[in-house]
Amino acid sequence: MDFWHDAAAQKRWLRRFALLTGVLLLPVLVLAVFARPSADDFIYAARTHAVVQQYGLDLPRLLRAAWDTNVYYYENWQGLYVSGFTLAFQPAIFGNKYYGATLVCVLLPLFFCLYGLARCVVLRLDPAQRRLPWALALLLTFAFIEGMPAPVEGLYWFNGAMNYLPYFSLTVLNAGLAFALCFADKLPTRRKFFYAAAGCVCSFVIGGGHQVAGLLNVLVLLLAVALCAVHRRNFWQVPALAAAMAGLLLNVLAPGTQVRTAGFAGAGFAEAVVKSFILAAMEWIRWLDVPLLCLLALLVLPLLHLTRSAVLSDRVFRHPWLGAAVTFVLMWAMIFLPSYTMGGIGAGRLLNVVWMTFVQGLAATEFLLLGWLERVRGVSLHGAEQFCRRQARRLPLLAAAMLLCMACIGSHTVKEGQDSYFATSLEAAYELANGSARRYADALDAREALLNDAAQPDVSIRPLNDDERPWLLFYTDVAPGPDMWGLTPYFGKQSVTISDFE
């Protein structure tokens, strides 16, 4: 029986695939136990931490404290009318040992939003493939974890990861909803209204999460609206686009945004355009590496199957280069915004979401290219497919080898000097084995105990040593001098000073 119509075979493959990726990701999950708060984690969570210290898990007071934090930063620092609220709930307000929950807070939305996108696309093209969305979501999540350019800012540091990844994840889901609404004439009325309403909610939340994710969401929806309006006279994505633009404007025009941008020397418009173009081009060169080729190879067979769907006309595949062009424009726009407003390309956490956009864009381009070969150029790929079927016993080993390659080599080539690091799984295993993760956690736990000592209203702490700074867990540390992290109000001290004891 053909694999795509053999439910039992698909179930076996999915189970084995999930087991293998779970084993490969085990060091990443274990390493989260040693993650600890730093930098803005303390500043944003000062109010909620005070509530926990005084009242325990008092939900109404916690919600009020988080809302007050949100309002304060909206008016005084940045117009993120959603993320300030979520950042106030960094897990360490309940104690350092809970901070590892950051990884779960990041990965669950990412996985399920990728699943939502895959489900909207796959079940529209081939309703029989009910397990394929789970496999695609798991594969992309695995690839994102292993190749993330700045994993500490995307997986283990709460303030950095939660200020970007959840809103990027919602943008991914919104793209899936927009795709489903492209076929609104084939959807039940209730489902059309549900998808449109969900798109509006997602768009408004994204707008209050981060400006870059908000801009990406607007551009993706704008593309969907333009394509559907021209070719299908379909306007079901317009409400989500309106909500996205309203949310982004509410963010950009906030008083806090004006305060933040006034503190940076933004680049001129032409300079920002050119610099963003050059950086986007350089990223394409740097990120086209072996792990990415392994990912694209793993996607070939499922994407080839989907290109044969009768739901899509041949016209869709006429210009496969448009996939790469749209991907480049999206990357350029995401880099342009911080370049123009703040004069720089942004931190590693921004490059994380640019990289994930790049990966998904290449997957879409691969889909268009395969469809172009078969349905436009008339190149039959059935021979290659038959060869793969004859090698059915070897395919699991080949797929496992590619996953192992992705878990070892990684894609950490965004910034100069990072080429020596492994992929996230292997690097996590290395840091667990050499004890640097344990030393990092022990040092910060000792610091927390000192800061929680009520008998010491004035506290002096030391920076971390070099052997207490594992690459995957360490983002930054205090520097000798006054407290710049907000440790004083967070721990309720009269003063906190930092001394270099070495």
List the model feature ranges, each with a label.
Residues 32-100, 158-161, 203, 207-350, ...:
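Transmembrane catalytic cores of multi-pass membrane glycosyltransferases
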Residues 101-109, 139-142, 162, 205, ...:
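Hydrophobic alpha-helical transmembrane segments of multi-pass membrane proteins
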Residues 180-204, 235, 239:
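Short hydrophobic alpha-helices at membrane interfaces in multi-pass membrane enzymes
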Residues 303-418:
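Transmembrane helical hairpin unit
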Residues 2-77, 92-134, 377-502:
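Intrinsically disordered, polar/acidic, low-complexity terminal segments
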Residues 13-28, 135-142, 198-201, 240-246:
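Alpha-helical transmembrane segments
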Residues 130-182, 210, 333-367:
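Membrane-interface micro-motifs in multi-pass membrane enzymes
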Residues 110-121, 170-182, 218-227, 297-303, ...:
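Transmembrane alpha-helical segments
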